[in-house]
Swiss-Prot record:
It comes from Cryptococcus neoformans var. grubii serotype A (strain H99 / ATCC 208821 / CBS 10515 / FGSC 9487) (Filobasidiella neoformans var. grubii). One of its GO terms (molecular function) is transcription coregulator activity. Interacts with transcription factor HSF1 on chromatin. Transcriptional coregulator that functions together with transcription factor HSF1. It holds the Pfam family HSP70. GO terms for cellular component: nucleus. It is found in: Nucleus. Belongs to the heat shock protein 70 family. InterPro entries: ATPase_NBD, Heat_shock_70_CS, HSP70_C_sf, HSP70_peptide-bd_sf, Hsp_70_fam. Disruption phenotype: Sensitive to high temperature. Normal cellular melanin level. Increases SSA2 mRNA level. Mildly decreases virulence in a mouse intratracheal infection model. Induction: Induced by high temperature. GO terms for biological process: regulation of transcription by RNA polymerase II. This is Transcriptional coregulator SSA1. It comes from the Eukaryota. The gene is SSA1.
């Protein structure tokens, strides 16, 4: 049985891990990298995912999609979505109130939901794990930012379903990182641990109490729209202005130039974590102008000052909510690539009176590590290390219903341990009211208009009665994934109605998921067909060139007519290869057969002559046959295969 894996589906990079031989193994991808860019690219002939997609982004900016996590489970008119669209070269459109991504693939216009793009990244992670484990992977624990709301969690679960994964559990990233930190520290007594998780696109802070394998989250806070990408944006804007000052030209209209600049900025940002200054050199950036400049760490810190400082607010909120004071926090653990920034480390350290944060876990891999441990537990692993492990997580936001006057009445308060169930009795607002509309919201504000509507449903058929008499019991049930189910019942008639908050505006239906799953299979088949075509082309090319080498190395050993016939055919094939850019696998195979039909009799005659040539030692020219045949053997199909 192939194991369940843990997947950290990140904004900018993703990572997959598995529990095996009593420990976690982080699985490297086909490029040997332990994290994979969350990028998907489309072009005229194929779809690329991961490193291959990110590597070609400057050549194909409009059809390379990234940051899907910043769109998933959101509404098109969200302020963050609108702001992000200014930075993205790919086109985001409004599809019944939800954002969708429009690209050109194989010469056709295609529209994908953020769930589909995320599912493609998940498929890549699934395939990475399958290559390593040598079997089909169908079960996974997928992580989300702790501060993701209900719609974002549900959409992430849908992405898993489209990727053909049974998502055993959605767990919070900081909680997963806490497992990575605390797994081997079971016997150290009770500890209060603060996880500070700043990644490529999201930011979470969670405070946990860890004792004897029980990980209890006390409070969580964060910003689902703050991370390394935002620091890159500040650098990009800074250099666009500098380029404008120096050259009186605005490069922001050119997607390719912007992308090249962004890649350089990301590299510069990383360098500034270990160096005080770095230079940027981009040849022919825009209108043939080379852009050479430099930036200091101090300037970078100044450009991002407000963003860096804003990371302290959730830390304070978590301390307040958990009623634990700074001095009682035993460890501060940094997670996420952006915590490598020295200024961030200093702010965290200053916040806790100069205490050094704990750096014992890998900030890029900790989340996938914890997810893999949870996957092992959920599939019944009996290893001693995972035996007594218990996760108690919390709901990040209050959830409740709208009552008269647009008031938000929370049933489940934020930071309540999940799974949880809570019921309250409500009544009608006017006499003889036949039904009630139950509107479910999440958020911390007093008025529902300032909160996020999760969904609504009607409870009808209430018998006529004066206001305040009917008793309507509303129960909220939050499962272990942090996803909400709501039930309302009229106590006098026993009539009830319930919904899983599928955010009727935001959630994909079962049919849509099935359609997307079928499409994902189709894309996979297309990807495989494209790979087979490339293989057929490469096979033909290497066969033709190996024949060419044999012909030129042994010109005097061939019959002159044979030499001319075969040379002519080989040259003809090589020149047609240059023009066959969009040929099919069958065309390449047909051409190979044609070439073999001409080559085989001539090569058989040639090897026969080499083997039986008179004079000298037995076997004719020592090594001649071998030398002539070697290229064909090593590079293409061997000549002996076809009679």
């Amino acid at each position: 049985m192939v194991k369940a894996v843990g997947i950290d589906l990140g904004t900018t990079y993703s990572c997959v891990a598995v529990w095996q031989n009593d420990r976690v193994e982080i699985i490297a991808n086909d490029q040997g990298n332990r994290t994979t860019p969350s990028y998907v690219a489309f072009n005229d002939s194929e779809r690329l995912i991961g490193d291959a997609a990110k590597n070609q982004v400057a050549m194909n900016p409009y059809n390379t999609v990234f940051d899907a996590k910043r769109l998933i489970g959101r509404k098109f008119e969200d302020a963050e979505v609108q702001a992000d669209m200014k930075h993205w070269p790919f086109k985001v459109i409004d599809r019944s109130g939800k954002p969708a991504i429009q690209v050109e693939y194989r010469g056709e216009e295609k529209i994908f939901t953020p769930e589909e793009i995320s599912s493609m990244v998940l498929i890549k992670m699934k395939e990475t794990a399958e290559a390593y484990l040598g079997g089909t992977v169908s079960k996974a624990v997928v992580t989300v930012p702790a501060y993701f709301n209900d719609s974002q969690r549900q959409a992430t679960k849908d992405a898993g379903a489209i990727a053909g994964l049974d998502v055993l559990r959605i767990i919070n990233e900081p909680t997963a990182a806490a497992i990575a930190y605390g797994l081997d520290k079971k016997s150290e007594g009770e500890k209060n641990v603060l996880i500070f998780d700043l990644g490529g696109g999201t930011f979470d802070v969670s405070l946990l109490t860890i004792e004897e394998g029980i990980f209890e989250v006390k409070a969580t806070a964060g910003d689902t729209h703050l991370g390394g990408e935002d620091f890159d944006n500040r650098l990009v804007n800074h250099f666009v202005q500098e380029f404008k000052r120096k050259n009186k030209k605005d490069l922001s209209s050119n997607a390719r130039a912007l992308r090249r600049l962004r890649t350089a900025c990301e590299r510069a940002k990383r360098t500034l974590s270990s160096a005080a200054q770095t230079s940027i050199e981009i040849d022919s950036l825009f209108d043939g102008i080379d852009f050479y400049t430099s930036i200091t760490r101090a300037r970078f810190e100044e450009l991002c000052q407000d963003l860096f400082r804003s990371t302290m607010d959730p830390v304070e909120k978590v301390l307040r909510d958990s009623k634990i004071d700074k001095s009682s926090v035993n460890e501060i653990v940094l997670v996420g690539g952006s915590t490598r920034i020295p200024k961030i480390q200093k702010l965290v350290s200053d916040m806790f009176s100069g205490r050094e944060p704990n750096r014992s876990i890998n900030p890029d891999e900790a989340v996938a590590y914890g997810a893999a441990v949870q996957a092992a537990i959920l599939t019944g692993d009996t290893s001693e290390a995972t035996q007594d492990l218990l996760l108690l997580d919390v709901a990040p936001l209050s959830m409740g219903i709208e009552t008269a006057g647009g008031i938000m009445t929370p049933l489940i308060k934020r930071n309540t341990t999940v799974p949880t169930k809570k019921s309250e009795v409500f009544s009608t607002y006017s006499d003889n009211q036949p039904g009630v509309l139950i509107q479910v919201f999440e958020g911390e504000r007093a008025k529902t208009k300032d909160c996020n509507l999760l969904g609504k449903f009607d409870l009808s058929g209430i018998p006529p009665a004066p206001r305040g008499v009917p008793q309507i019991e509303v129960s909220f049930d939050v499962d272990a994934n942090g996803i909400l189910n709501v039930n309302a019942a009229d106590k006098s008639t026993g009539k009830s109605n319930k919904i899983t908050i599928t955010n009727d505006k935001g959630r994909l239906s079962k049919e849509e998921i099935e359609r997307m799953l079928a499409e994902a299979e189709k894309f996979k088949a297309e990807d495989e067909a494209a790979a087979a075509t490339v293989q057929a082309k490469n096979g033909l090319e290497s066969y033709a060139y190996s024949l060419k080498t044999t012909l030129s190395d042994n010109q005097d050993k061939f019959d002159s007519a044979d030499h001319e016939t075969l040379s002519k055919k080989v040259d003809e094939v090589i020149s047609s290869l240059d023009t066959m850019q969009s040929a099919s696998k069958e065309e390449f195979e047909g051409l190979q057969k044609e070439l073999e039909a001409v080559a085989n009799p001539i090569m058989t005659k040639f090897y026969g002559a080499q083997g039986g040539a008179p004079g000298g030692a037995p076997g004719g020219f020592p090594g001649a046959g071998g030398a002539g045949g070697a290229p064909a053997h090593e590079e293409g199909p061997s000549v002996e295969e076809v009679d």
